[in-house]
From Swiss-Prot:
Subunit note: Part of the 50S ribosomal subunit; part of the 5S rRNA/L5/L18/L25 subcomplex. Contacts the 5S rRNA. Binds to the 5S rRNA independently of L5 and L18.
Record HAMAP family: Ribosomal_bL25_CTC
Record keywords: Ribonucleoprotein, Ribosomal protein, RNA-binding, rRNA-binding
Family as reported in the entry's similarity comment: Belongs to the bacterial ribosomal protein bL25 family. CTC subfamily.
Protein name: Large ribosomal subunit protein bL25
Gene this protein is translated from: rplY
GO cellular component, as recorded: cytosolic large ribosomal subunit
Physiological role: This is one of the proteins that binds to the 5S RNA in the ribosome where it forms part of the central protuberance.
GO BP terms in the entry: translation
Lineage: Bacteria, Pseudomonadati, Campylobacterota, Epsilonproteobacteria, Campylobacterales
GO MF annotation terms: 5S rRNA binding; structural constituent of ribosome
Length: 178
């Protein structure tokens, strides 16, 4: 489990000192909860996020174990190092917006006809409670030929999960290679 420390000071100099010690600055917030300013070891955080099987993962901060989801992160534009991450507290029964990953399965027919598979949306925004949150959307692309696409409206409908995207937006498609 990922363990972090609570930041006593939120000043610029304290943030610089933590970053120089290899920490990633983070904020944990939730509906009706007080914000928690904390820091995680950068390499431990990256390892934990890459190895998680679900969008929701547990962290331990200040002796308390809480379930969170990565809401937003900031990267250095030059070095691509993580600078800051916002973690949202997952509260049972509270409907929240999540970004659910999209995964493709199969090999598209259009690839044999000189086509290229393009994944336009890697994540789809949904609104639901954490209990109903899907781990990912699995899309079968084996029937896609050149010029075909799977749109948001073609996603499987899940109970108590509302997709908050325009229905005409393409998620994955096969285009003709030049």
């Amino acid at each position: 489990m990922l363990e972090g420390i609570i930041r006593e000071s939120i000043s610029k100099s304290a943030v610089k000192a933590l970053r120089n010690d290899g920490y990633l600055i983070a904020n944990i917030y939730g509906k009706g909860q007080e914000n928690t300013h904390c820091a995680f070891k950068k390499n431990d955080f990256i390892r934990a996020v890459k190895s998680k099987t679900n969008i929701i993962f547990p962290v331990k901060v200040g002796g308390k174990e809480i379930n969170v989801v990565v809401q937003e992160y900031q990267k250095d534009p030059i070095t691509s190092d993580l600078l800051h991450v916002d973690l949202m507290l997952v509260q049972p029964g509270v409907e929240t917006k999540f970004l659910v990953p999209v995964k493709t399965a199969g090999s598209a027919k259009g690839l044999k006809n000189k086509g290229v598979l393009i994944l336009s949306k890697k994540r789809v925004k949904v609104k639901c409670s954490p209990e109903n949150l899907p781990a990912s959307y699995e899309l079968d692309v084996s029937d896609l030929d050149v010029g075909d696409a799977i749109l948001v409206r073609d996603l499987p409908e899940l109970p108590n999960v509302k997709v908050i995207e325009k229905e005409s937006v393409a998620i994955v498609g096969v285009i003709k290679a030049k």
